[in-house]
UniProtKB/Swiss-Prot annotation:
Heteromultimer with KCNB1 and KCNB2. Interacts with KCNC4 and KCND1. It is found in: Cell membrane. The gene is KCNV1. Residues 1-214, 264-280, 336-349, 432-504 are cytoplasmic. Detected in brain, throughout layers II, IV and VI of the brain cortex. Detected in cerebellum and hippocampus, in the granule cell layer, Purkinje cell layer, pyramidal cell layer and dentate gyrus. Detected at lower levels in olfactory bulb, amygdala, thalamus, hypothalamus, midbrain and brainstem. GO terms for cellular component: intercellular bridge; voltage-gated potassium channel complex. This is Potassium voltage-gated channel subfamily V member 1. GO terms for biological process: action potential; protein homooligomerization. Residues 172-185 have a biased composition (Basic and acidic residues). It comes from Mesocricetus auratus. SUPFAM superfamilies: POZ domain (SSF54695), Voltage-gated potassium channels (SSF81324).
Amino acid sequence: MDLSPRNRPLLESSSLDSGGSLSSLDSSVFCSEGEGEPLALGDCLTVNVGGSRFVLSQQALSCFPHTRLGKLAVVVASYRRLGALAAAPSPLELCDDANPVDNEYFFDRSSQAFRYVLHYYRTGRLHVMEQLCALSFLQEIQYWGIDELSIDSCCRDRYFRRKELSETLDFKKDTDDQESQHESEQDFSQGPCPTVRQKLWDILEKPGSSTAARIFGVISIIFVAVSIVNMALMSAELSWLNLQLLEILEYVCISWFTGEFILRFLCVKDRCRFLRKVPNIIDLLAILPFYITLLVESLSGSHTTQELENVGRLVQVLRLLRALRMLKLGRHSTGLRSLGMTITQCYEEVGLLLLFLSVGISIFSTIEYFAEQSIPDTTFTSVPCAWWWATTSMTTVGYGDIRPDTTTGKIVAFMCILSGILVLALPIAIINDRFSACYFTLKLKEAAVRQREALKKLTKNIATDSYISVNLRDVYARSIMEMLRLKGRERASTRSSGGDDFWF
């Protein structure tokens, strides 16, 4: 009889109650599709997965010899044939417990996930369990010895996208947890004044840890905003502006940023690792141009006019870097951090978006240039000028400085705008789903951090007998409710945007 996955004996299962037994089942449960007569009870085995019992055909399981149950069927057959000899393999190597008398084998796994595994044994097709995250489903099928490449084509694309997103966020979470553990356990456990450095670090890096930290965070945000506004006013030539006052304000803001960076630098022990972090690099780039500008201006006093012009250009370039101060708000904004995570994760989608735009710009700019070049006073003087027009048209900005005048040119412009709308809509939906997932993941993490800090503070107060009467259960319940609320918002957001495939 052919035992191929499409033509093998039909596998039947039954979930029994606690009082059920193998002999109480009707013999039709064990009927094979090819022969039309019941299989012998000795050809079946009972597996108990998470409290649910399933009666399976050993003959059908043997069609999958590389899976856990396929190996179990072979081991059970060998065990029956050889008995309890030393050479016979034991079924306990493949299951958590066994009852050889009733031919029942126990597995402490999810019975809901096992139903998908059972369907695979029946049909040879593995479908993804939507109620389980991708990584948990992968752990389940790996336990049963099924490769993820066996997932059917209808679920494969959705599964691998969810798995990639889960792995990325888990890696980010593990990295952040390791960094947090490194800072709390290594940076302050050694060196002078560990308690002072720990408290100072909490004020600088954890705005919600105390009242002083919240005040410091607000002041830091104010200085960033004042610095940006001051930079904009210094570039404006207005008669009522006091440039000397603006310069003094610039010195004050730079002094604050410098002191903040030095305090962070002095608090940590691994300073090389501190300087490699992106937020600290941004802080350094925000203050270095100011000091380099002062140094260049002080050294350019005895140079010629040409050299002074070159120095002036260098100073202007360095002053442009002051705009990076806006990125300092990322320390206090979950949205900005989520944007950074999204760009990091969606580099393929962003590259695809740029590729689509580049192809469209190249095609439509060339067509538009040749359609408009016969007009005497045309604004399409060259293909690069047409590039600018195609860019503003495909992104639906439309400055109007360059526009077509001929009928053919207007038809091409309509097609350019329409293609831009369609092309931009494709990857942006994916990027939006990733941003929503990253944002709510960070919010959940912040809620967990606040819960951990509150529990640590209560534990410390209890240890010193200086605590106020607080119900620890209520604190824990409030934190859990906050995380559940955020998780519910995440589900609602992903479903409303059509992003069920990215919910994990």
